[in-house]
């Protein structure tokens, strides 16, 4: 038989060879496992599960700092700005790598990137644990941040590209579920080691096991067929896809799936990066909607509630590292409980409705928490303890007065009177206008009245009666925070990703999500690294009330600007968003509907007559 004829002949003989015709060239492919036999289902599940360990690591690393920070600020005598740098270092690393991570993904592939980021996580964790210093901790957390940011993108792409089309939604949901499970694990281990000397080392080291497991197993799994096609490795792509689809009945033929991948890749090549910032098809408006959505998502306070959970709880009455960390562990439980129903409700209710309901719950819970923090007098409480504002060796009796100079070295003042009521000053915080005092009574931290500073940078401090946080306010604060977390988990947590994947056309979706992801990390970094400073300046209640106000703005934004995606195809959504008058039409939609009902157009009358 002539070579040209042989190159297009297809045969069902298992011992023969398959030849797939490409529009431009004829590619010779060796026969791989039959799509009708084999265990492709198990291979897909294994590949997705190992890749989604990245979600577990992301959730774990984001949540563990809440409890570990209580120990670290004592071990390393961290000041308020230094605590913010420890928290923000992970976010800074994530932001930096999100800017250029796409190049690594496209050049080296999803599988290699996942392996690389797992090893990077191991390196950052070992640096944080083995070298006990502030800068080693910051650099180690930056490396971990780079790891979780890039691996999160790589694992989602890998899972979507190796799974059959009918499974892709569930595979992405598996990643989201792994994130919240990682958060639960992070909170749980933080509590377990809260009372152990150097327990923060064990908490940080908990990331080593899943990272090493992922780095060890991932090389044994197949690469993404889409990446192989992008690298012009069609023979390998065909063989890999045959392995992944072997034995799965509800999938299209491998050749058809390869053809669909080529068409999608061709559509992506039609759009450049700069197209995102042009008015064609309202692309710039779509980008602004996505950016505003993720900004408001972070501005509702979610990063700070997550990272500073134990710190906030200790200020509202949960004294002691163990108590505050145990209370924050409930956040992980609630996150899991809120994410699971969201997965099942999104197709029935729609993401827009879930966003509105969840954000309203967040708004009410933060308003309640803000009122409680004012009643419990946490508005004069310092959330920071550093080397420059602690005088643990100074003992006073209630009613005593003494002169305390600014920048007093630790232990300068010795006990002036024999301790009678077991009351002693534990911290002094200079806010430029007032001294904010905390003191301990029978191992329970209580708040003191503020005293104005004199022009000579000294103050007459009159020790006042104890102000205990009542048990009822303490537990209402915890419930308010748990309700806030539940509202976030059923709405902003998973639904923002659903909306972002729907408002951009297929050809430019990857570029758009990358830009918004970088903006998301930058916003997260800004909010997390200013939380303690803001609470010192304006007070915790004011900060909490600002979160409630941002939640209200977010509800209005979702109602006005976020399109309804329930029961609509991506093509329908994109067509509507591409209309030049979409923004104006959205703002006036209710007025137009009313007008259309009252006065039908001539075309509608003609159609009705027909």
UniProtKB/Swiss-Prot annotation:
Glycosylation sites: 392, 429, 438
Topology Cytoplasmic: residue spans: 1-49, 106-118, 163-176, 223-286, 347-353, 497-511, 564-610
Disulfide bonds: none
Tissues with expression: Expressed in the main insulin-sensitive tissues, such as cardiac muscle, skeletal muscle and adipose tissue.
Membrane topology reported for the UniProt record: Multi-pass membrane protein
GO cellular component annotations of the record: endomembrane system; membrane; perinuclear region of cytoplasm; plasma membrane
GO molecular-function terms, A-Z: D-glucose transmembrane transporter activity
Keyword Nuclease: no
Keyword Membrane: yes
Disruption phenotype annotation: Morpholino knockdown of the protein impairs the development of the embryonic heart resulting in abnormal valve formation. Embryos also show poor glycemic control.
Recorded catalytic activity of this chain's protein: D-glucose(out) = D-glucose(in)
The entry's keywords: Cell membrane, Cytoplasm, Glycoprotein, Membrane, Sugar transport, Transmembrane, Transmembrane helix, Transport
Top-rank lineage group of the source organism: Eukaryota
Entry-linked SUPFAM superfamilies: MFS general substrate transporter
Protein's cellular compartments: Cell membrane; Endomembrane system; Cytoplasm, Perinuclear region
Segments on the Extracellular side according to the record's topology features: 71-84, 140-141, 198-201, 308-325, 375-475, 533-542
Any matching Pfam family: Sugar_tr
Gene Ontology biological process terms in this record: circulatory system development; D-glucose transmembrane transport; glucose import in response to insulin stimulus; heart contraction; heart development; heart valve morphogenesis
Main location (coarse class): membrane
Transmembrane segments: 50-70, 85-105, 119-139, 142-162, 177-197, 202-222, 287-307, 326-346, 354-374, 476-496, 512-532, 543-563
Described purpose of this protein according to its UniProt entry: Insulin-regulated facilitative glucose transporter.
Family: Belongs to the major facilitator superfamily. Sugar transporter (TC 2.A.1.1) family. Glucose transporter subfamily.
Protein name: Solute carrier family 2, facilitated glucose transporter member 12
């Amino acid at each position: 038989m002539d070579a040209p004829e042989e190159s297009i002949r297809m045969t069902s003989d298992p011992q023969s060879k398959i030849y797939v015709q490409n529009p431009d060239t004829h590619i010779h492919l060796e026969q791989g496992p039959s799509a009708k036999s084999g265990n492709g289902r198990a291979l897909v599940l294994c590949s997705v599960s190992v890749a989604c360990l990245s979600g577990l690591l992301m959730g774990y690393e984001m949540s563990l700092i809440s409890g570990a920070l209580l120990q670290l600020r004592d071990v390393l005598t961290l000041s308020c700005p230094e605590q913010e740098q420890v928290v923000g270092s992970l976010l800074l690393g994530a932001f930096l790598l999100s800017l250029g991570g796409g190049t690594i993904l496209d050049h080296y592939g999803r599988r290699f990137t996942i392996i690389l980021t797992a090893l990077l996580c191991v390196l950052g964790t070992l640096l944080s644990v083995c070298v006990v210093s502030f800068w080693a901790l910051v650099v180690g957390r930056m490396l971990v941040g780079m790891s979780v940011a890039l691996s999160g993108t790589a694992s989602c792409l890998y899972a979507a590209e190796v799974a059959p089309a009918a499974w892709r939604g569930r595979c992405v949901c598996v990643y989201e579920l792994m994130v919240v499970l990682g958060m639960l694990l992070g909170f749980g281990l933080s509590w377990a080691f809260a009372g152990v000397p150097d327990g923060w080392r064990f908490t940080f080291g908990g990331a080593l096991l899943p990272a090493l497991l992922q780095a060890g197993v991932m090389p044994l799994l197949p690469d993404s067929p889409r990446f192989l096609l992008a690298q012009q490795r069609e023979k390998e792509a065909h063989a890999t896809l045959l392995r992944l689809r072997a034995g799965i009945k509800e999938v299209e033929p491998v050749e058809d799936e390869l053809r669909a991948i080529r068409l999608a890749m061709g559509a992506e090549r039609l759009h450049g990066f700069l197209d995102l910032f042009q008015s064609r098809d309202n692309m710039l408006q779509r980008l602004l909607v996505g950016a505003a959505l993720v900004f408001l998502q972070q501005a509702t306070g979610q990063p700070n509630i997550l990272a500073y959970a134990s710190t906030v709880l200790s200020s509202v009455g949960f004294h002691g590292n163990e108590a505050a960390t145990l209370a924050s562990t409930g956040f992980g439980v609630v996150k899991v409980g809120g994410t699971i129903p969201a997965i099942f409700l999104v197709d029935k209710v729609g993401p827009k409705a879930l966003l509105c309901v969840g954000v309203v719950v967040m708004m009410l819970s933060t308003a309640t928490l803000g009122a409680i923090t004012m009643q419990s007098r946490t508005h004069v409480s310092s959330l920071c303890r550093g080397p420059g504002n602690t005088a643990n060796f100074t003992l006073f009796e209630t009613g005593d007065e003494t002169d305390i100079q600014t920048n007093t070295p630790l232990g300068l003042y010795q006990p002036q009177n024999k301790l009678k009521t077991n009351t002693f000053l534990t911290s002094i915080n200079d806010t430029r206008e007032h001294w904010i005092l905390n003191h301990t009574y029978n191992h329970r931290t209580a708040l003191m009245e503020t005293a104005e500073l004199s022009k000579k940078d000294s103050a007459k401090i009159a020790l006042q009666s104890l102000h205990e946080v009542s048990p009822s306010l303490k537990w209402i604060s915890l419930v308010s925070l748990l309700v806030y977390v539940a509202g976030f988990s059923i709405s902003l947590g998973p639904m923002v990703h659903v909306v972002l994947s729907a408002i951009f056309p297929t050809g430019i979706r990857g570029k758009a999500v990358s830009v918004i992801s970088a903006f998301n990390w930058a916003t997260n970094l800004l909010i997390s690294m200013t939380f303690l400073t803001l609470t010192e300046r304006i007070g915790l209640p004011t900060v909490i009330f600002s979160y409630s106000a941002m939640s209200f703005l977010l509800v209005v934004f979702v109602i006005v600007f976020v399109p309804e995606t329930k029961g609509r195809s991506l093509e329908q959504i994109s067509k509507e968003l591409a209309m030049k008058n979409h923004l104006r039409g959205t703002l006036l939609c209710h007025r137009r509907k009313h007008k259309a009902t009252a006065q039908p157009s001539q075309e509608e009358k003609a159609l009705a007559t027909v």
